[in-house]
Each structure stands twice: as structure tokens, then as C-alpha cells.
Amino acid sequence: MISECLDRSQHFGVLRGKEQDLAEIGCTAEILTVTKKYPDGRMDIVTEGRARFEVIQLNQERSFLQAEVLYLHDQPEIASKAEIAQALKLHGEIMTLAGAEPEKSSEIDERQLSFHLAGSLPLDLDFKQTLLGMKSEAERLRAIISFFDTILPTMRRTVHVRRKAGGNGHAG
């Protein structure tokens, strides 16, 4: 399948598998680079998500799944500047607590901010799947802000405890 996509400059669809089921909402992926080719035909690839879709009907005639899909488009509701700023602030704090360098907001496309923020962190897969099905950037950003607000107190406590333990009880 990957060879076909490369030969034809096509994207492929990605669906989350859970137990014996597949999610109904997925995302197309564009192959950016092939980092390694193996003698048996397998490849290590770097991809980037492009377009969300809903599966209408699966086709199992080939060695890989194919599907008839309906592409999903966002409703025109846009996030407020305050919501964007809050999401970036919380994301930056999470990155800092995790020991990573927060990104500069000027380097992020605000039209796809929710997907960028969710994709840059190892968040709960059920939460990410829920985001994929949401109909507007504003709705996704509000969900991300709520999620970050929920996880940050635990992260702050964990980092504080680690610092205190690492300082033999003398860290402040």
C-alpha cells in the first residue's frame, strides 16, 4: 500500500483500531519521507495528517483495507483570541513541566492549532479520537483547554514531588 501511495503521490487513510473494532472517523496521512527501506519491502516513514474523514463503507478485497469515505469539514466557528492564548499558555506549561522546550506561537498555524497541540503531546487516545470527530476548531480548543486544566494539577504535584525527592527534602 505504501509503495502504491508513493508511486501515485497519494495519501492513505488512518483509522484507530480498538480491540476488534475500527473507529468510524479517521484522517488521511501524507508521506513526507521514507527514512528506511527493508529487504522484505517494509518501510519506515514519516507522515503528516491532512484531512479528516468518516468511513461510509469498508472494502476488504485487497490485502489492506480500503473504504468509501466522506470528508469532514469544519463549521466556520473560530476560536477567540483568548481561547487561543489560553490553550497555548497551558500547552507551554505542560511542555515545560515535561522538560521540553515550548514552541513559539508564531510557528503554529492557528487554523489547525487544536490538532497541533494534541499531536505534540502523548495524550489519551480516546481524547484524541474525540477531537477528530469535533466539528469546529473552537470546539476542539475548548475541549483541549478543559483537558489541560484537568491534567495540569497532577503534573504540577508530580514535578514538585520529584524535585523535592531529588533535593533530599530541601527543594522548595
Where are these regions (language model features)?
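N-terminal low-complexity, acidic/polar interaction/targeting segments
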Residues: 1-172
